[in-house]
């Protein structure tokens, strides 16, 4: 498996990164992520154009046209799970690693109960707050228009994902 990735460049605080997944050189999947950059000390948003190290590294003709829309949660959600964030869920910065949230979402949706003929074809996660080891997230699920949604709420009632 080969993952090929690049950024699209940006003049605003929002930056897109595109991914191609290849097996034996054949495309088998793709992904898009949207990011904002923030200063480590002051947490102020930065523009990608302020990062001189990244000048000229855009993907050019490889850039995808797909953009991500803001997620609109269903009005009614039901509590499905409470999950304590563990040390093994975190990255070097002490935050829960982004890849772990996809696992939490799939677990909350009970994907193991799907027939083998059905599978997850699209996944969009909106990160709204950082979680750390020891934090507890309540995972709520809901459905709207044939799509399934999962929301993570921290102990203070603030949305995390």
Q: Whereabouts are the PLM-identified features?
A:
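HotDog/MaoC-like acyl-thioester-processing domains
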Residues: 2-73, 128-136, 142-161
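Short amphipathic
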Residues: 75-88
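Active-site helix/loop of acyl-thioester processing domains in fatty-acid/polyketide metabolism
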Residues: 97-118
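Short structured motifs
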Residues: 122-127
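Generic secondary-structure microfeatures
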Residues: 23, 35-39, 87, 100, ...
């Amino acid at each position: 498996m080969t993952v090929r990735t690049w950024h699209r460049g940006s003049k605003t605080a929002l930056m897109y990164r595109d991914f191609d997944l290849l097996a034996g050189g054949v495309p088998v999947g793709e992904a898009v992520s949207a990011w904002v950059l923030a200063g480590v000390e002051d947490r102020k948003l930065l523009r990608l154009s302020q990062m001189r190290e990244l000048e000229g590294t855009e993907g050019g003709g490889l850039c995808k046209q797909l953009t991500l829309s803001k997620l609109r949660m269903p009005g009614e959600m039901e509590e499905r799970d409470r999950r304590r964030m563990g040390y093994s869920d975190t990255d070097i910065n002490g935050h829960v690693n982004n890849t772990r949230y996809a696992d939490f979402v799939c677990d909350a949706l009970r994907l193991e109960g799907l027939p083998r003929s059905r599978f997850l074809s699209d996944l969009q996660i909106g990160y709204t707050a950082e979680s750390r080891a020891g934090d507890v997230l309540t995972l709520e699920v809901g459905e709207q228009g044939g799509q399934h949604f999962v929301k993570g709420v921290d102990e203070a009632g603030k949305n995390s994902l």
